[in-house]
């Protein structure tokens, strides 16, 4: 196996990518332990990724998603600090599979018109896939705020596909 391509890519990362990566990893670790501070690191990571999505990768739906993450990070921080009525910690939940099926089908259908707009009016690349991943990421973020355990399944699939886009 030739690792020179991997080395070249790692060596070619700029400050925004490194800051985005490091704060993103901290975000995931803190979210795993249900620490509200995770949202602060998520906001920083999203700002860096938004910049790169626009300037280098031309993934406009993803750039919009990062803007959404910045806003939702503030909401998530507030929700996780506030907790439940009476100061109780927000519990971890699991949503029914039918709900996930409906959301996945809905995101797939909504991706067609949204991707058409992005392809027609911007220099977006990979319009449908970028849009589908963006919509599913919005849903996964909602699940994370709700502390739904299934958010991790979404993130594993979404991030695996994003690796190929970047």
Language-model segments: what does each one mean?
Residues 29-37, 52-59:
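Short, hydrophobic transmembrane alpha-helix segments
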Residues 38-54, 70-72:
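Hydrophobic alpha-helical transmembrane segments of multi-pass membrane proteins
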Residues 40-44, 61-64, 153-157:
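Hydrophobic alpha-helical membrane segments of integral membrane proteins
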Residues 51-62, 117-124:
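Helix-coil boundary and interhelical linker segments in multi-pass alpha-helical membrane proteins
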Residues 67-85:
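Membrane-water interface of transmembrane alpha-helices
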